[in-house]
Amino acid sequence: MTSEAWLERVPAGDIVLCGSMSAFGTIHRIARELLERGLPTVVPEPDGAAWDLATPQRLLHLKRSASMSHLKRVKAKRTAAVLAINVDRHGVHDYIGPNTFAELALGFAHGKRLYLLQDIPEQYEEELRAWGAVSLDGRLEILVSSELQLAVHPHQLSLFEDWQGVAHKPHTPIAA
């Protein structure tokens, strides 16, 4: 194994991005930046043309389905962290809407690390601080360095995988 291969790291898991659909462009831009820095990301599905043409009843079904799909991604075993893209919206600084707050709560309940792109909004300050949410104040490098420090070396993964494949036998004492 070369020294370069030894230094390579595999991210501990996916970073699930969430936020208001009005920030969809920002969500995708940040996902690309994280991917370029070696962190795999998961983004919400975009609202499609079907949403624009849907009846009110169909729209509720589409929203429910999209929410359920993204919530499953938040709680997935391969997810390491949740990043809320809480950009200013409608004059509200550090906006976190109800779906984003639900995704953060689910992430907390499943032991995921929580990050906020901007600061912690006052209305959720107590909960988010209690949950250990990290405010990035727009500095993605905080998330990148934290997540890469938690990354594992490929040889550690292969040792773990090899170990899982070993059949475990009860210990038999050696006769004297």
Predicted features and spans:
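Conserved catalytic or regulatory cores that recognize and/or transform ribose-phosphate-containing ligands
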Residues: 1-176
